[in-house]
Structures are given as C-alpha cells and as structure tokens.
C-alpha cells in the first residue's frame, strides 16, 4: 500500500506523503480499520526514526482517516459547495477550487482528471473521454455541464501542452501536491472530514437524487458493474444522451 514511498528517504517524508497513502486507500474503498492499521504502522516507523534522531516528529499523528464504519459516507452540503465555488478566482486557492468543482460536476476520480489530455476534451460536443484502465472505467464518456464549461475551456486555452491541467513545467500535475492544496482549501472553507474522493461520492449521490437513469450513472462514473451490461445499452455510450441525462443534476 505504501509503494509510492519505497524510493523515498525516511528523513524527507512529511505528513502529506503519508496522507497520500491513506487517501489512495480510501479511493480504493478500503475500510477505516485498514487505514488505522496503516497509520499505526507509519506511527511505529516514525517512533523508531525519532529514537534514531532521523526525524523529530511523529507525522502519523497528523493523518486524517475516513469516517468510521457504519456511518453514512460523507457528502458535501450545498453551503459547502458554495464555499468552494466562491474561491475559484482566488490567487492562492483558485485552481484547486476549480479542480474540486469539476470533480463535483463529473464524478471523476482525481487521478482521472489529472491524467486527462487535451486531445480527449471535446468542447463543442461537451464531453471528455478518459478514465482509469478498467473494463468499465477506461475511455468512458464524461459530460461537461454548464457550471464547469468555462473552467474546462480556460484550461484548454491555458495548457500549452498535452495535459489539460499541467504543472508550470508542462508535466502532469502531481497528485500529492494537489491533495495537499485540497486539504488547505478545505481548511480555508472550514470544511471538515472531506477527502478528494468525497467529491466523487457527492456527485454520484446527487446523480441518483436528481433521477438520472441508473445505467447512465454507471456509464458516467465507470462503475465496474456497467461493463457487464454496456453492450445491451448502446445509447448509454452516446455523448449526447449522457449529456442530456447529466443535465438533470443540480446542486
């Protein structure tokens, strides 16, 4: 689970690095118990490193875990979404707020958005095509709704390279850095108990609440059970149809 840290020096690791592992576990659907065990392991490593004078702080004590099992998974309220939206033009938090809004209006995973290439964005037809490399998730149609159209259009004009949201160096944005900025944005908005994956869950919950057809929701989100029925519902791979369904979604 901590594979991204294997090649790093222990003295260089900070709370954000350990949090990245926890966040990845949450995105994969692992339980709070699994996350607690991973945090305990990180804590033991930090305690050993402190005893060896390698570091001077137990960074594991700063990690945020998902809600306890048995509680309903967290979704953002309309007021919290407005708090995020209001910071889209902020010099410090603007890009992160824009990323959050796109995730809220597409249901994409953060990795999927950061991996999006400009060539896969079709502004005229109002959809993107991408997703994780799974049978149901890869190369799926992701409609672009009006509230995020200008964000996507700006990113396309501003990119200057293959990535839709590149770093200043023209490379793919680092998920760890984005996650760190996301936590800072949540603190700025006084929003607690939220991870990037919460945005996907909020979007999927809103789609269901607003009455989108079940197979359309599955297609847009790339749910694994959609791959077994996709061939029976050819229309659900049609960008115009999926956009029409997504337009039912209102926050």
Segment roles from a protein language model:
Residues 120-125, 193, 212-232:
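Short, polar N-cap/turn motifs at the start of nucleic acid-interacting alpha helices
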Residues 74, 80, 106, 115-154:
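Conserved tyrosine-mediated DNA breakage-rejoining catalytic core shared by Y-recombinases
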Residues 35-36, 51, 55-110, 114, ...:
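Basic, Lys/Arg- and aromatic-enriched nucleic-acid-binding interface segment
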């Amino acid at each position: 689970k901590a594979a991204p840290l294997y090649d790093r020096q222990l003295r260089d690791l900070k709370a954000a690095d350990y949090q990245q592992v926890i966040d990845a576990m949450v995105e994969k659907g692992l339980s709070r118990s699994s996350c607690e065990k991973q945090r305990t392991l990180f804590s033991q490593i930090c305690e050993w490193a402190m005893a060896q004078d390698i570091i001077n702080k137990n960074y594991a004590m700063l990690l945020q875990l998902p809600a306890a099992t048995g509680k309903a998974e967290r979704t953002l309220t309309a007021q919290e979404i407005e708090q995020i939206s209001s910071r889209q033009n902020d010099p410090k938090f603007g890009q992160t707020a824009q990323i959050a809004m796109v995730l809220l209006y597409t249901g994409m995973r953060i990795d999927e958005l950061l991996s999006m290439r400009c060539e896969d964005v079709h502004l005229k037809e109002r959809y993107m095509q991408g997703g994780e490399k799974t049978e149901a998730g890869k190369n799926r149609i992701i409609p672009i709704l009006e509230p995020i159209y200008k964000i996507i259009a700006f990113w396309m004009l501003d990119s200057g390279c293959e990535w839709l949201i590149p770093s200043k160096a023209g490379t793919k944005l680092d998920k760890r850095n984005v996650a760190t900025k996301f936590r800072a944005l949540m603190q700025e908005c006084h929003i607690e108990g939220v991870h990037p994956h919460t945005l996907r869950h909020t979007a999927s919950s809103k789609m269901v609440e607003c009455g989108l057809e079940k197979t359309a929701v599955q297609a847009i989100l790339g749910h694994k059970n959609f791959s077994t029925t996709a061939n029976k519902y050819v229309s659900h791979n049609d960008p115009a149809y999926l956009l029409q369904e997504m337009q039912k979604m209102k926050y």
